[in-house]
């Protein structure tokens, strides 16, 4: 992997519940960068929660808003961005992420994701009779897309949030994005 701009943006991709927001926020704090979550940004811009947007506009309307937010945010510098789990479904989003920063895929198996998200009613795609099966289906479709745009993959299985943050920082150091991992 070639050395990159030391001020490069860092973008997190992965399925819902993988830890993109939690880990992303901690990485941003350690790098002294501004953190954004694309879903939170959509909610701030519309004044509506994600389930309401899905209900009113459908998934296609939500994805249009998501593409606009990703396009806008990836033009900034020195940011850390946690994307929504489905952001990679659109080729233009994958290209935008790949071309404007370092992409980190936080990978978790569907069973672990189900354990983390099973009580969360703010995830419209999981409001089904078989949310675990839904996560497995989403994983099958999205895993190759996450891998396509990722500069590296971090397995989220057992490590603590701090452990995951340190793994991300180590990869950023190896990629030439930071001089050395910063201490907590």
Swiss-Prot record:
Cofactor: Mg(2+)
Domain of life: Bacteria
Pathway where it operates: Metabolic intermediate biosynthesis; chorismate biosynthesis; chorismate from D-erythrose 4-phosphate and phosphoenolpyruvate: step 5/7
Single GO BP term: amino acid biosynthetic process
GO-annotated molecular function: ATP binding; magnesium ion binding; shikimate kinase activity
InterPro entries linked to this entry: P-loop_NTPase, Shikimate/glucono_kinase, Shikimate_kinase/TSH1, Shikimate_kinase_CS
Keywords: Amino-acid biosynthesis, Aromatic amino acid biosynthesis, ATP-binding, Cytoplasm, Kinase, Magnesium, Metal-binding, Nucleotide-binding, Transferase
Classification via CDD domains: SK
Localization per record: Cytoplasm
Cofactor note: Binds 1 Mg(2+) ion per subunit.
PROSITE patterns, per database record: SHIKIMATE_KINASE
Summary of subunit composition and partner proteins: Monomer.
The protein, known as: Shikimate kinase
Native organism: Burkholderia lata (strain ATCC 17760 / DSM 23089 / LMG 22485 / NCIMB 9086 / R18194 / 383)
Gene name as annotated: aroK
């Amino acid at each position: 992997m070639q050395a990159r701009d030391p001020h490069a943006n860092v973008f997190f991709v992965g399925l819902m519940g993988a830890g993109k927001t939690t880990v992303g926020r901690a990485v941003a704090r350690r790098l002294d960068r501004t953190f954004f979550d694309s879903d939170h940004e959509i909610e701030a811009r519309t004044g509506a929660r994600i389930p309401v947007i899905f209900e009113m506009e459908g998934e296609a309307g939500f994805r249009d808003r998501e593409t606009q937010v990703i396009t806008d945010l990836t033009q900034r510098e020195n940011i850390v961005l946690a994307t929504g789990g489905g952001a990679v479904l659109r080729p233009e989003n994958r290209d935008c992420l790949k071309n404007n920063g370092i992409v980190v895929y936080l990978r978790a198996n569907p069973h672990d994701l189900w354990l983390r998200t099973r009580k969360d009613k703010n995830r419209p795609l999981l409001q089904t009779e078989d949310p675990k099966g839904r996560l497995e289906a989403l994983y099958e479709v999205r895993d190759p897309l996450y891998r396509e745009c990722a500069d590296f993959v971090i397995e989220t299985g057992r490590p603590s949030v701090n452990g995951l943050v340190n793994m991300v920082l180590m990869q950023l150091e190896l990629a030439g994005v930071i001089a050395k991992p910063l201490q907590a």
